[in-house]
Amino acid sequence: MDLYHTPAGALDKLVAHSLHPAPEFTAAVRRALGSLDNVLRKNGAGGLQRPRVIRIIKGGAHARGTALRGGTDVELVIFLDCLRSFGDQKTCHTEILGAIQALLESWGCNPGPGLTFEFSGPKASGILQFRLASVDQENWIDVSLVPAFDALGQLHSEVKPTPNVYSSLLSSHCQAGEHSACFTELRKNFVNIRPVKLKNLILLVKHWYRQVQTQVVRATLPPSYALELLTIFAWEQGCRKDAFSLAQGLRTVLALIQRNKHLCIFWTENYGFEDPAVGEFLRRQLKRPRPVILDPADPTWDLGNGTAWCWDVLAKEAEYSFNQQCFKEASGALVQPWEGPGLPCAGILDLGHPIQQGAKHALEDNNGHLAVQPMKESLQPSNPARGLPETATKISAMPDPTVTETHKSLKKSVHPKTVSETVVNPSSHVWITQSTASSNTPPGHSSMSTAGSQMGPDLSQIPSKELDSFIQDHLRPSSQFQQQVRQAIDTILCCLREKCVDKVLRVSKGGSFGRGTDLRGKCDVELVIFYKTLGDFKGQNSHQTEILCDMQAQLQRWCQNPAPGLSLQFIEQKSNALHLQLVPTNLSNRVDLSVLPAFDAVGPLKSGAKPLPETYSSLLSSGCQAGEHAACFAELRRNFINTRPAKLRSLMLLVKHWYRQVAARFEGGETAGAALPPAYALELLTVFAWEQGCGEQKFSMAEGLRTVLRLVQQHQSLCIYWTVNYSVQDPAIRAHLLRQLRKARPLILDPADPTWNMDQGNWKLLAQEAAALESQVCLQSRDGNLVPPWDVMPALLHQTPAQNLDKFICEFLQPDRHFLTQVKRAVDTICSFLKENCFRNSTIKVLKVVKGGSSAKGTALQGRSDADLVVFLSCFRQFSEQGSHRAEIIAEIQAQLEACQQKQRFDVKFEISKRKNPRVLSFTLTSKTLLGQSVDFDVLPAFDALGQLKSGSRPDPRVYTDLIQSYSNAGEFSTCFTELQRDFISSRPTKLKSLIRLVKHWYQQCNKTVKGKGSLPPQHGLELLTVYAWERGSQNPQFNMAEGFRTVLELIGQYRQLCVYWTINYGAEDETIGDFLKMQLQKPRPVILDPADPTGNLGHNARWDLLAKEAAAYTSALCCMDKDGNPIKPWPVKAAV
């Protein structure tokens, strides 16, 4: 079913036979959705008010008639009478969704014959998601169930919604596409009234898109619906016939994708420029970075979203496809794309025409001229329109020509030579522009700068190896300018000390200038002046006004030119500070200066000393707003940052430069009202990333940047705070922190002021920009691959309250279930292939292939986990033979693995290690859709000592007597007992396996802390210790997670007494085994015997003291403390059996 190898003439057959959904699955889904529809209508949405279901509309690819075989989607939009406005939809969904989920749980027990039901994690709030799949999992459909406000009501066919529907939508201040569900009916009608063959072309495009998805793991691709709209546009502009060549249509769509940076497409079938509010909004939308593809049903939803999606990945693949078999005629000639307004021309890289929807709907300047950007620099006009950039072109407004005339005109002039030849097409519903951006402007973005600031070169275009020099050359302020600023600040302070009425105690310099994170072009300085008259937090506000008036008067009188080449300008004032600007005569830089009178809460502190606890208890009891008294702690804030290594502060400059470019791109646009998070939040995020993921003086700048960008994308999970200045041991601080930790994420607390949480601002927009930057060269290594981020989680275990540990495990440690299912399916395929094909022409036989490691036990952690594939071979007849002929055996298994890789189809990315080691064979299975999710496998040939063992039965004692007589090193033949090791853990309750995950995560954090000091005990030893703690202390399948964790830490602290073993598989009944066990148990503590292999002592010869030290530190952390600050009590478990 490979598209590229299908001849152009066979594409219709490919669509008919391979892309249309399986009829029996479609019928089963239709029956299931009909049944669910009845249940929902009958029961309503539950709850106290029992809202009435007005109607239910089906959307998504399934309803639009563009569903692909394999996997597709459907949207069930439930219009309820209790939702009377767009605002209601935001606030009322929690109770409604809870009631609907209860209905779904009942209905999902039996969704219909041939179907399975499983809930999925919601991609957005206000939505319930589940999956219906065929029993063989070959076909599935993701169902999104959305309660919605019936904005449209009962629409008549071909009747536009009233304009007030859209003006009401825009006045609701919604996010882009937030209420798209309300317009599902329009979206569905827009697509499924199209000719059958056009929908076949859509299937072909989506099949190509799916093939790209399987090859790209990390990139965030545009939604497939964007490609449906692009396909419709291509057909409208270039064909409009019911019968056409699929190859030609596909070639046209891919050419548009290749030229995506010039796309600006919209339709006016449902909304237009007639209404002033809608018209003004559309004008702003059409100025967004390319590509712009507006949903024909909801103008707030830009499917192109040039700043969020990796269109460049699709464009690269589109370009690669043009010479493939699917675009070759039988004669060998290449298929040419359609020609038409706004479409690429054969052999010409630029798009054919800049086009607008119609003269009366076009964007007009003050003189009534249409503003369209030129296709080439040579087309720039000599007299640009007033108020427009120099690159804008003036085109005289002209009456609407008829459709027929427009098409004739366009056919004659595909690539216009003069602007006057450009025509206006009333039927095309599109405006396409060509930008002439500078080399420093990234694809899809306009180059914007704030007056008085220097943006510098575009970060996305800087190779990763040049980032250090880029920071030095373009981001660091000049030492001469910094000296000027210091001189000006000293002059200002001297003036205030001498001239002001009130006595100044001391001064603190803060802001980015004080912290050493100021960027070239524009920086901020915070001068906090501590006055004797401001004696406490509560009294600070009462005297501030008169002090500020005095300050302003003195500065205006005495300090107009505080330093040579710098002038002082007063700007808009706020109630608690004086705001000024230091402006150099050449206007090359700008310094925003805030002067704040404040209460000296901290006093002069010695280096490294903490403020007194009463400082913070006084702050919390003052009843202040969040961050209201942040200025009082400016010195602590400055010291927290400027004591960091120079390279870490360079990384902060890089992050802030990216942040500044994002802010400039959206300045004055539709998102301008939704301010970005404060830049200081990104400084703290950068410190957190470095502390948790690196901690070294020298590091890769690209890796650090990518880590910060990844954390920005995880903003909904961020929980970050430090206790360098305040402590959880203080009851008032602890109670305050626990309240803060109950808030929605992100949570980033100022390390100097615990009341200041930097959750404000449009984190979603910043996350979209972070995702867009991840595909650029600044984050690519020399071989073109993305540099790896540091291993940093968005929240820390020791900062998680004890009562939240189950949630912490579920959110951050539990692997994705769908990925685990994919891995299991892939491993089953590999095992079967190896068993059937290895040593086919040899006397050696593969007896069985067994999966081991954390993945098999059910204790794998989210992210990168490990597993073993143990291949039991007939050529090994005893333990001592296991090492013989290893190189030849590994070579044969590798050859078959490579054959399996080529011949079999996998839902995951299957990579065999290229490491040249004749004794080791490894491969990795990686998710194609989830970032950072993979399992590393080691393939291990082994002697089948156990044979076919029945479940629950003990091995023959002779197995262990042979083992004892054969082994030389502890655990030498442990691979032979993989099945027993796996079953010992996998049979345990689910919650116990969650506790094992928690202990393993803690262990991995400890490994980072003690790196270089010695080898910690093996991780498997801690798994066994956790099982022992539960067996001896609880045995309840539903135990308290904090108590279980605390017990394991307690046992680690008692490592000198540890003696743990089991007799589930071996015992003292046999004399040889009994004597051996006595010898093992008499060895120095700790002793933890492998329950499957008595030769394996997992407590021997490791730095338990380092682990015990870390365990002791954790017992006083929030995760081991109840809400009153008392330590969680461990279970009563003895350290020895």
UniProtKB/Swiss-Prot annotation:
User: What is the protein's major site of localization?
Assistant: cytoplasm
**GO: which molecular function terms?**
2'-5'-oligoadenylate synthetase activity; ATP binding; double-stranded RNA binding; metal ion binding
Sorted alphabetically, which PROSITE patterns does this protein's record hold? Answer: 25A_SYNTH_1, 25A_SYNTH_2, 25A_SYNTH_3
Keyword rRNA processing assigned? no
Quaternary data: Monomer.
Query: What family name appears in the similarity comment?
Result: Belongs to the 2-5A synthase family.
Q: What is this protein called?
A: 2'-5'-oligoadenylate synthase 3
Phylogenetic lineage? Eukaryota, Metazoa, Chordata, Craniata, Vertebrata
Gene that produces this protein: Oas3
